[in-house]
Amino acid sequence: MSSAIERKSLDPSEEPVDEVLQIPPSLLTCGGCQQNIGDRYFLKAIDQYWHEDCLSCDLCGCRLGEVGRRLYYKLGRKLCRRDYLRLFGQDGLCASCDKRIRAYEMTMRVKDKVYHLECFKCAACQKHFCVGDRYLLINSDIVCEQDIYEWTKINGII
């Protein structure tokens, strides 16, 4: 289960934060170290308040309060995206090399086919594709626009 991490402030003049709290700092207890939170900025996640340094992945220890990070909470564990996918994600096979793709790896997807980034290249000239490049998917082979005619001719498709 993915959960948002909210950034909080006790100073109403500070922007941007998700919310300015009107709670005396002495009443806020960190969900990690159980100490009072006297910091100007702190986090709220899993219905608790946290020092920014105390909200971390239970497996790898990375800070979950950094901008752009998501918190995954399952079976009582706070997890980063990578560790969540490593534990609970589903692995698959690359349509090009037939080797395992780990759930946390970056991939390219074309229709129902999934590829390692390094395998997402033209089957004829081996050129890696860039954003905007045109290609054709023939079975599980990806062929660049320049090689389509030759590839289909060699492989008896036309």
UniProtKB/Swiss-Prot annotation:
GO molecular function: chromatin binding; metal ion binding
Pfam family name, one: LIM
SUPFAM superfamilies according to UniProt: Glucocorticoid receptor-like (DNA-binding domain)
InterPro entries reported in the protein's UniProt record: LMO_RBTN_TF, Znf_LIM
Superkingdom classification of source: Eukaryota
GO cellular component terms given for this protein: nucleus; protein-containing complex
Compartments where located: Nucleus
Tissue-level expression: Expressed in early mouse development in central nervous system, lung, kidney, liver and spleen but only very low levels occur in thymus.
Family annotation (SMART domains): LIM
Positions of the LIM zinc-binding domain: 30-89, 94-153
Function: Acts with TAL1/SCL to regulate red blood cell development. Also acts with LDB1 to maintain erythroid precursors in an immature state.
Written domain comment of the UniProt record: The second LIM zinc-binding domain interacts with KDM5A.
PANTHER family in UniProt: LD11652P (PTHR45787), RHOMBOTIN-2 (PTHR45787:SF3)
Protein name: Rhombotin-2
Species assigned in the record: Mus musculus
